[in-house]
């Protein structure tokens, strides 16, 4: 996922809504062209296709230079030794996720899960938002109350992939230490089995408007105890809970019952992303010995930072 140039979303939304209002027929290619006409459009998910063929969106070219690496430091220190990770603290999630945290005005919290079936290439991503950073309504509201813009975003990739992202108000949100409920969907951390259970009950968007329902279970091989502050002030934090995991997908669509490799992280912030970042992107790469991750940042002050980390299967 890459995030930047957030103002373009409002322009895109007005054009797309206008086309829907005129009852123009939906065409995935036209929709993709509309998206690609905006530089660094914030949503990277492609329109769903029914032929099983997905073209990879063009990625940005980066200068070839050494990526910092390292494990952790006691404080924020992006030094030449690359020791940027620090012990996770302040949210009660150093050993397991805690969904019952306070998200301040102008802030956000999201929990991200993805998984890939290595043989077919099918994939899924889920993001649970409090203070949805993709929501134009959250921005238009002045970001006064993050709890009033919550959603569970799910995207499936492969034959007849689906996309769902319904913005809901605070009445749809229930926060408990080990369970996050957003409308009819929920994330539950099973303390006994040490696994994350995601119950999905959503409606997918164009072109396949239909009920998207089922259960996705993520079983980490280990939980890390570290986080990466993305700014010196700590206004944005990346918390890689389970870089290595097994995932079981059971959705109410033909051929959408599979297992594969998974991933689980979270991001927390006390300021809007566009206040501090021009651009960021990240990636995770499963290996025999665990998972390697990279993080690339461009701050509003034009400084650039690159990080690379390897996490063993047990989270160390």
Residue ranges, per PLM feature:
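Generic detector of N-terminal low-structure segments
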Residues: 8-14, 18, 33, 37-38, ...
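Short, flexible coil/linker elements and helix-boundary hinge sites characteristic
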Residues: 21-25, 39, 194
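Residue-level detector of intrinsically disordered, flexible termini
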Residues: 27, 44-47, 73, 117
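Intrinsically disordered, low-complexity N-terminal regions enriched in serine/proline/glycine
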Residues: 25, 37, 50-52, 107, ...
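Structured soluble/peripheral alpha/beta segments that form catalytic or ligand/cofactor-binding pockets
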Residues: 60-316
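A cross-taxon signal for low-complexity, glycine/charged-rich
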Residues: 2, 15, 19, 23-25, ...
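Short, compositionally biased, intrinsically disordered N-terminal export/targeting signals
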Residues: 3-7
């Amino acid at each position: 996922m890459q995030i930047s140039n957030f103002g373009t979303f409002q322009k895109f939304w007005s054009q797309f809504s206008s086309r829907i209002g005129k009852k123009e027929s939906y065409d995935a290619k036209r929709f993709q062209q509309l998206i690609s006409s905006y530089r660094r459009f914030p949503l990277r998910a492609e329109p769903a296709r029914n032929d099983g063929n997905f073209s990879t969106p063009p990625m940005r070219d980066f200068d070839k230079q050494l990526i910092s690496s390292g494990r952790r430091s006691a404080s924020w220190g992006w030094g030449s030794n690359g020791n940027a990770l620090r012990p996770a603290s302040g949210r009660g999630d150093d050993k397991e996720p805690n969904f019952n945290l306070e998200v301040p005005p102008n802030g956000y919290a999201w929990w991200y899960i993805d998984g890939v079936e290595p043989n077919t290439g099918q994939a899924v991503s889920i993001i649970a938002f409090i203070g949805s950073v993709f929501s134009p309504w959250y921005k238009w509201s002045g970001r006064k109350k993050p709890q009033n813009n919550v959603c569970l975003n799910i995207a499936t990739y492969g034959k007849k992939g689906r996309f769902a992202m319904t913005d809901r108000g605070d009445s749809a949100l229930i926060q408990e230490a080990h369970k996050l409920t957003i409308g009819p969907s929920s994330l539950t951390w099973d303390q006994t089995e040490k696994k994350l259970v995601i119950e999905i009950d959503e409606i997918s968007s164009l072109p396949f408007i239909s009920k998207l329902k089922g259960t996705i279970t993520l079983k980490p091989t280990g939980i890390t105890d570290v986080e990466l502050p993305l700014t010196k002030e700590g206004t944005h934090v990346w918390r890689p809970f389970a870089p290595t995991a097994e995932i079981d997908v059971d959705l109410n669509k033909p051929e959408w019952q599979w297992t594969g490799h998974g991933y689980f992280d979270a991001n927390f912030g006390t300021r809007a992303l566009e206040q501090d970042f021009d651009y960021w992107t990240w990636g995770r790469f499963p290996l025999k010995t665990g998972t390697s991750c990279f993080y690339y940042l461009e701050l509003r002050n034009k400084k650039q930072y690159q990080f690379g980390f390897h996490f063993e299967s047990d989270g160390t």
